[in-house]
Amino acid sequence: YSYGQAVNRILDSGKLKREDIWITSKCWNDSHERSQVMSACKRSLENLGLEYLDLYLVHWPMGYSNDPESGLKISDVDYLETWKGMEDVFRAGLAKSIGVSNFNIDQLERLHANCNIKPAVNQFEVHPYLSNCELVDYCKSQSVHVTAYTPIGKGGSSNLSKDPVLVQLSYKYNKTWAQIALRYNIQRGISVVPKTSNKDRLVENISIFDFELTGPEMDAIRDIDREQRMVTFDATKNHPFYPFEEPKD
């Protein structure tokens, strides 16, 4: 996500120590061979100017290569091989923990049955219009921590900002609809990573620990689930390891 220079600046300034911040990076889809994973991690560390990551994730279960002529070219590398490379990274001390992103239940079960080190985290899309309850519950049952990306939706692709339930709760608690959406997942025991570089938004996003939604309010938000996925990566839909099902009618 090209934040290496920002990380370098803040650490070089002395305002924060390395141990004061949590830094996650991901192994991209064109580095899924076991021998490539270590090199990809080292490149990330070099770009960030770091000696280790707090968390390193397999970005997607499906691998591919970028063909200059034909574009995306599906790779037949199994994510089980990729995970062996992730275990190598962990053993080498380049990442304090390793995990996955966008893995479904079947893929996690297969990974658990064939790994030496279980993933610590599964990062996937979770927001009030996609509560992903089944996957969240499965991860919790396996002691896999859930991190939610797009926890307040994505750009103009959702109507979360106008949802009556979120708007009503925002008035009650004197918060924004986005803060209500973030608080919803926090109370589910889910970490959230809203994407912004705006300072005011950063402050707003962290200002969600001075109130608590009631049980009925949590249920009301859960009930607005539309199974509305906003990140689909359509270019890889034909890959055998594509993790998402077609939306229900």
Say what each PLM segment does.
Residues 1-21, 38, 152-155, 247-249:
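N-terminal binding-site loop/beta-alpha segment at the start of enzyme catalytic domains
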Residues 3-6, 36-45, 82-85, 165-166:
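Short, well-ordered amphipathic alpha-helical segments that serve as non-catalytic structural scaffolds
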Residues 4-18, 45-50, 112-115, 136-142:
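Acidic (Asp/Glu)-rich catalytic clusters
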Residues 17-31, 55-61, 123-126:
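A short, structured active-site edge motif that brings together acidic residues
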Residues 26-35, 71-75:
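Active-site mouth loops of central-metabolism enzymes
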Residues 33-48, 106-108, 130-131:
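Short, acidic/polar
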Residues 37-58, 88-92:
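CE4/NodB-like, metal-dependent polysaccharide N-deacetylase domain
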Residues 60-249:
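Beta/alpha (TIM)-barrel catalytic core signal, keyed to glycine-rich beta->alpha loops juxtaposed to Asp/Glu
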